Structure formats: C-alpha cells, structure tokens
C-alpha cells in the first residue's frame, strides 16, 4: 500500500501489492504474486473479482480512513471484515524480515502440498461461499479444477519428482578411500540409513518412495501428502549430510 499515501511502496514480496506511480495515477495497479504456471487465468480472475466484490460490499458503509485502519490492523485486533488473528499489511520484506514462525502466525501457514491446498475448499466454507456467490464459479467447475490439480500432482510425483529423488539417493555413494576416520564412518552410516529408508524395500518393510506411490495409486491423498512432506525433509537431510561427508574426504 505504501508507507504513507504520499510515499508509495514497491514491496513485491507480499501476496498482493498496490503498485503506484505518483507522476501517473493511471498507472496504479494491483499485483497478485501467488499464481503458479498452471493457473487458469479465467478461473483466477473470476475468484479475484468475486473476492473484490465481497470486500467492496463490506467497505461500502465505511470511510476510507476506516478501511485503511482495517487493512492495517495488527494480528489479534478485531476488525469489521478481516480475520481477527491475521495481519494483512507489511512494508517489510516478508522473507528476510520475518522468521518462518512469525510469517505463519501473522499471515497464515501456506499449504505444503497440492492436497493441503485443495482441502481448503472444505476447510473454509465461508471463503468458498465468497468466490461462488456471483455464479461464475459453480460447484462443478471447482470440482473439475480440484480433480485436475490432484491428477497433475499425482502424475508429477510418480513420473518426475520421485524418480529425481531416487537419482539423488543413488548418487550418494560411499567414498572409496584408504583414509577413513570414525566421523566418516558415523556420517556414512547415517547417510546409508536415510538412503535405505527412502528407497530400499524389504520383504517386511516398504521404503518411503514405495509407500508414497502406493498411497497415490490407492487415492489415499491425505497419507500421500504427509509422505511427500516427509520425503522432502529426508532428501534435504540426505543432501546436507552427504555434502559434509564428501567435504571431509582428502
């Protein structure tokens, strides 16, 4: 929004920004930065305009000063329209000037997976009612969008993401050297344990990759979502440990 009405901001780390040029009022625009490459332009515009109209209706009986105070309120402060426990405005870099815990507390936790994102249609019925109120987004359209997003998520995981992570696991090999310390042995045992947990099946126990693929194929998306988050964490841990392991080799 800007530091003051006279000092515009070009903070582009936020979800939606008001971009202004004091020398050209007609250049004022809103900038939404949450869309991904798969976003359907027509659907997102329908949702945006429906949400804007809901906000316009709520603000129609309030002064501009009251509306500014509403969007500038602190988390925990009661407002006439916006959620009590959320903050909506920042002139700071939200990635550099806030910790992850602060971002979550003030602005909400972003969904970690596509499944978590799609669950928001069920978790927030009041917000769903807002974007469907005008009739542009019918239940059939939303359900078709949801089904398409989940199919693409499943396909991406099985056909691309899991194979790429499997390659990372296979590339983490034990170093062949005559000079090995106890630290090297300790690190390799941890690394190999993670490798096996991620990618190696046994008769009695399935690897995380196999469990994730099975959950996706069985349509158990809640389980698959949790396993995807765990997979990312384990792969990052593996890469970090292997980097330290390799650097200690001489």
What is the predicted function of each stretch?
Residues 1-250:
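C-terminal accessory/tail domains of diverse enzymes
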């Amino acid at each position: 929004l800007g530091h003051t009405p006279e000092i515009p901001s070009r903070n582009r780390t936020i979800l939606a920004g008001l971009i202004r040029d004091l020398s050209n009022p007609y250049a004022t625009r809103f900038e939404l930065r949450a869309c991904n490459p798969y976003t359907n332009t027509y659907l997102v515009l329908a949702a945006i305009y429906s949400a804007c109209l809901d906000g316009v209706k709520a603000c129609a009986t309030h002064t501009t000063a009251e509306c500014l105070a509403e969007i500038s309120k602190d988390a925990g402060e009661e407002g006439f329209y916006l959620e009590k426990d959320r903050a909506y405005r920042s002139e700071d870099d939200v990635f550099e000037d806030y910790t992850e815990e602060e971002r979550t507390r003030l602005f909400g936790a972003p969904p970690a997976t596509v499944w978590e994102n799609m669950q928001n249609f069920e978790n927030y019925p009041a917000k769903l009612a807002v974007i469907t109120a005008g009739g542009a987004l019918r239940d059939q359209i939303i359900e078709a969008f949801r089904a398409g997003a989940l199919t693409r998520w499943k396909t991406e995981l099985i056909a691309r993401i899991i194979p790429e992570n499997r390659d990372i696991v296979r590339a983490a090999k034990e170093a062949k050297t005559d000079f090995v310390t106890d630290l090297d042995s300790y690190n390799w045992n941890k690394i190999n344990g993670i490798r096996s947990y991620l990618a190696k099946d046994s008769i009695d126990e399935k690897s995380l990759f196999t469990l994730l693929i099975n959950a996706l194929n069985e349509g158990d998306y809640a389980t698959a979502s949790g396993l995807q988050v765990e997979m990312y964490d384990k792969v990052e841990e593996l890469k970090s440990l292997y980097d330290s392991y390799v650097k200690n080799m001489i």
